[in-house]
């Protein structure tokens, strides 16, 4: 009999539903038991965040900075600038639209009530270093490896990255549904889960519309550069979009993205280089989601969300997206460090960010891979071999 496999998104959705359902009748002692698990898991996650940054950013900087040519540098720069643009577009739209949706939502006191479910005990696992130190260390080490070309250090960094990715895949992601279950169990027990969910649904609808607008803008730029119809170019990329909706993986969608990019007239040399590279470093859709979710949660809790703070957050987030691992939920795991260090998100805010992000993981990935086709068109305009 064929084994039924549930992906991360279905498990997260089931965890949310069960958390709300069981929270209506489970006794406080059981809720405290899950609060104990959440406390330990959260401390473990906070311990891992600097290691995730070092493990992912260091080899990424070493590879991008190794001087493989102008094509690599320009592709990486365009991918980064597009990611930053997506974050700024998301912030401005969220600031204009979300206040109308979040009015009457959960207040600061309501959000804080979930923290009143105290664990039986907790285990302190302090991080080895803070997030900013880890980020600066990663840049210094990565650039140093690129400059000196040390194969031994690169091999060590690559193996450490494998350890980090394996930890995310085997320890963090499998336990996330239980963690999310505990969060919504506590929120239901304290009576404010429904108001949070109501806001969640409204936010998801707006973010979906935003990512469609972002794709249109990306292909309008590509169309202007190549002097071609942007909507026809975007239409050609739709098979890649719908494939990514099903796989939630940029890497798994590469064959389809590459095929549709070639159908758009991009040369085989440029497409073969840019599509696999952008599948790793171009996460405009993921950035759009993370910024919007962060703005929404900060509005819900009356936290300041001024433009200066968010600009710094978006610039750092763009770097973290370059280094994000290619696993479901990898982008939000890579972003936890800057969410905490720049925006001041605590354990509960980070848990809600994870839940909200993963419920939209598939169309964020679809936005990422479809946008790769737009970047390939621009790169091809200037780097196609003339015959």
Outline where the language-model segments fall:
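Alpha-helical membrane segments and immediately flanking helix-loop junctions
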Residues: 111, 234-291, 318-332, 359-378
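Transmembrane helix-bundle signature of multi-pass membrane transporters/permeases
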Residues: 40, 44, 57-58, 75-80, ...
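Membrane-water interface of transmembrane alpha-helices in multipass transporters/channels
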Residues: 33, 69, 73, 193-201, ...
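Transmembrane alpha-helical segments and their short flanking loops
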Residues: 102, 291-387
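Membrane-interface alpha-helices at helix entry/exit sites of multi-pass transporters
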Residues: 69-75, 170-173, 263-279, 305-308, ...
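Signature of multi-pass transmembrane helix bundles
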Residues: 2-26, 39-48, 70-232
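Short amphipathic alpha-helical coupling elements at transmembrane boundaries
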Residues: 35-46, 155-170, 235-243, 259-263, ...
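Alpha-helical transmembrane segments of polytopic integral membrane proteins
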Residues: 19, 50-58, 86, 90, ...
């Amino acid at each position: 009999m064929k084994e039924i496999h549930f992906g991360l998104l279905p498990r997260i959705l089931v965890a949310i539903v069960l958390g709300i359902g069981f929270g209506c009748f489970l006794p406080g002692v059981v809720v405290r038991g899950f609060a104990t698990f959440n406390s330990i898991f959260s401390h473990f996650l906070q311990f891992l965040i600097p290691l995730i940054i070092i493990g992912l950013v260091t080899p990424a900087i070493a590879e991008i900075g190794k001087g493989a040519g102008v094509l690599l540098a320009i592709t990486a720069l365009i991918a980064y600038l597009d990611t930053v643009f997506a974050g700024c577009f998301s912030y401005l739209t969220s600031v204009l639209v979300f206040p109308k949706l979040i009015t009457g939502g959960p207040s600061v006191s309501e959000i804080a009530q979930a923290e009143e479910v105290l664990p039986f005990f907790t285990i302190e696992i302090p991080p080895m270093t803070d997030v900013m130190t880890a980020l600066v260390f990663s840049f210094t080490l990565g650039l140093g490896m690129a400059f000196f070309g040390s194969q031994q250090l690169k091999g060590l960094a690559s193996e450490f990255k494998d350890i980090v990715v394996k930890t995310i895949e085997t320890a963090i992601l499998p336990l996330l549904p239980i963690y999310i279950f505990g969060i919504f169990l506590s929120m239901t027990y304290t009576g404010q889960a429904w108001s949070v969910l109501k806001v969640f649904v409204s936010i998801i609808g707006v973010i979906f519309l935003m990512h469609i607008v972002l794709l249109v803008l990306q292909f309008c730029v590509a169309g202007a550069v190549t002097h071609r119809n942007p909507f026809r170019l975007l239409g050609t990329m739709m098979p890649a979009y719908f494939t990514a909706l099903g796989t939630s993986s940029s890497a798994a969608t590469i064959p389809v993205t590459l095929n549709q990019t070639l159908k758009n007239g991009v040369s085989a040399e440029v497409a073969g280089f840019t599509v696999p590279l952008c599948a790793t470093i171009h996460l405009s859709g993921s950035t759009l989601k993370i910024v919007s979710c962060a703005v929404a949660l900060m509005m819900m809790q009356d936290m300041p969300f001024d433009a200066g703070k968010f600009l710094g957050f978006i610039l750092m987030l763009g770097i973290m997206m370059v280094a994000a691992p290619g696993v479901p939920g990898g982008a939000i795991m890579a972003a936890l460090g800057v969410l905490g260090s720049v925006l001041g998100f605590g354990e509960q805010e980070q848990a809600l960010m994870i839940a909200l992000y993963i419920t939209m993981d598939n169309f964020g990935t679809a936005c990422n891979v479809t946008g790769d086709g737009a970047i390939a068109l621009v790169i091809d305009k200037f780097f196609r071999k003339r015959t």
